[in-house]
Every structure is written in C-alpha cells, then in structure tokens.
Amino acid sequence: MQKLLNFVIVTICIIFINCSNSSTNPNANIVRDLTTAEIKLTESDNKFGLKLFKEIVNSEENKNIFISPLSISMALGMTYNGADSTTLEAMHETLEYGDLTTQEVNESYQSLIKLLTELDPKVIFDIANSIWYREGFSVENDFIGLNTTYFDAVVRALDFNADSAADIINEWVSEKTNGKIEEIVDKPIDPLTVMFLINAIYFKGTWTYEFDEENTTDDIFYLPDGSETQCKMMSHKNDHNYFENEQFQAIDLPYGDAGFSMTIFLPKPGIDIDSLIAQFSNDSWNSWISSFSSQEVNLYLPKFKMEYEKSLNDVLCTLGMSIAFDPYQADFTKINSDGNLYISNVKHKTFVKVNEEETEAAAVTSVEITLTSVGETGITMCINHPFIFVIRENHSGTILFIGKIVEPEWED
C-alpha cells in the first residue's frame, strides 16, 4: 500500500523588510537599501503570504503542502493590472496593497525582481513571467505594456484550439523551472479560455555549510499521531543563528554568500505545529528573526523531496477575492474593454528537494482568464518531529519558502 504522505511543506514567497538583523554573516553581500514603496510592497506581500499560508494549512490538515506566495503574488499582480472597479478593490484588499498605488506596485515589483535575481552570485534564483492569449482575442495595449515593462512578461498569441498551444506553454514552464515542473496547462484548453498569466520561479542554493553524506543515517521521525517513520537524517555541528523560546527552537541555515537562507521552526514537545503556525504574523516574525544570535548547534535535519499542486480558487475567495471568480460580476475591462471576463482557475504547482549539498525548489502559478458563458556539547537541535522551515533572502527579507513538515520523505 502506498505510504500516506503526512507532512506539510508550505513555501511562501512573500516579500517584506526585516526590522533587524536578517543576517549576521560578515560575508553577506552589501546591497542597496529598499525604497519606501518597496518596503511597503514587501510588507504587503508578507501579510498576504502569511494569511495564504495559514488558510491553506487550515484546509489541508496533516498533508504535504508546498506553495510559493511570491509566485502567486506576481501572477496575481499581473492580473491586477487588468482589473477595474470593485474587482480591482477586492484584489487590492486581498493582496494587502494598502495605500500603494498601482504605479507603485508595478515599479516596486520591477525593481525587486532585479534585486532578488542578482543578489547572490552563488545562488540561482530566477523569476519569469508570461502572458498567453487566444489568437483573435483583442487585448488592451495598456495591459500588455504594463506587464511587459514592469514584470518583463513574454506575451504571445496562440491558437488555443490546437494541442500545440498547451505544449508551447508547458515547454516554457519546463524551461524556466529547469525541468522540475513540466506542465501547468491541461489539454484540451477550454474553448472559452482566452488567456493564461503565468509566473515561474526557480531556486537552487548550495548550503554555506554543507552536510557530510557520511554522517547521514537512517533515523526515526515522529508523526503527529505519535507513530514513527524512517527518514534519512543529515547532521553537522556549526555556528548558526539560533533562537528559542517556550514554544519552539529555530535555526537559520545560509546558502552561498548568505544572501538567502532556510529558517526552521521546530515546535517543542507538547506544542501543536498548527497552533504555532496560527501565530505567524508580521509582528511575530520580525520579533523572532530579530532575536536570533550566533551559537554552536548540533543539528539533525531530514532529507526530503516532494511535488505539490493546488487550485487556489477557494482559498483566494475566502481571503476576499470572490468577485474576481464571478462570471457575472468580475470586471477585467482593462484586459479587454468588452468585459465578460473572469478568473476561472488559479493553478499552483511546486517542487522542492533538500539534501546534504543544496536546496532546489521551483514554483509555477497560472491565472486562467475565461469568457463569461451566455448559457552532544552545547546546544543540540534534533529535528525528529514535525517542524516549520523558511527559505528567505536576507536583505529585503523576502521569504522564498515556508514549510511545515510532519513526515519527511526521500527517494533516490
């Protein structure tokens, strides 16, 4: 019988500004300060990403989850440029844009994409955007112009009636994720679908302090129901940024020149992982991160690898965007002035692999637009029970991934 996947990895790609020492590594690259608008956008994306994370965890208890809110935010950010009236207002509120203007949102995404992808020469972090629309469907020039200028989006018309259309889009997705995600559009394309807005993200970072494969052993991982499973447990002893309180231990594991890192939250015995996740907010996150300090840690971390897929329609409706999914109320007249358009599906797929040498992760988000139908010594941290992990960029405070693991799996 196939073993039940019983852990959750949620990858949040949100952007926010750290209030304190996001990295104490002296080798970290020195980069420019964020603008006021960029700071506001990072804070907005942080709020959106954390509430999205918590909503998905609430809806998928004890399941493997892995999402990229940065990918989701960017795909919806492009779509936002086509919204108007109450649909625009609902998306603005759901995405937590606050007092940011559309121009400020666009300009900040443009500059942050450049900053994030050029930050650390020892880490591969790529962001790609594209818009694919049905041949013969009229698209407003302003909509295309905004997304090509600020999101560097590739824009192309295709014959959606041909099977080759889905193949072309999926080939682009596979290329931009280094083959880790091969398909986002299914065949045949719905005859009423007129557009796909797609974001793809790829991350590959080598640990600053790699794990020795010779130290990896078969070990026990404790599941939420109290049962046990086997895992491949890596280990090493190093100085790391570390913090603990009454509820959890936390450690920060840098990649490359420490421009990016994975932050892991391990609930202490008796603390439910979902109750800890419920406490995640801008304030709590900033408070926790500012409390880290360098300490010698005996670390035990399981290897894991997984893929994940989810339609985000229900979650986004719960968070306040339901009008955008309503065929008769949605207003996307900035995409096409005739209107009669709505979001029929927001599809999200991800991949992650963590081993002794590196972390590799990828995410794709597709927003489908459809026509309305007329019808040892020192500290020891042994991660052998459910834990939370976050991969982040340390200058802007971008959370690239945030995960909840209740059962790590590894297959060679």
Regions found by a protein language model. Give the residues of each.
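Detector for small/aliphatic-rich hydrophobic stretches
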Residues: Q2-F160, I405, E409-E411
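Beta-sheet entry/capping signal
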Residues: K63-N64, V194-M195, S261, I388, ...
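Extracytoplasmic/secreted cell-surface and envelope-processing proteins
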Residues: T87-M91, I271-D274, Y308-K310, A362, ...
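C-terminal soluble interaction/assembly domains
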Residues: N345-D412
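Internal alpha/beta scaffold segment
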Residues: P267-F292
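Non-catalytic, conformational "gating/processing" segments within enzyme and secreted inhibitor domains
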Residues: T102-K268, S290-G375
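Short Gly/aromatic-enriched secondary-structure transition segments
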Residues: M91-L95, F211-D218, D274-D283
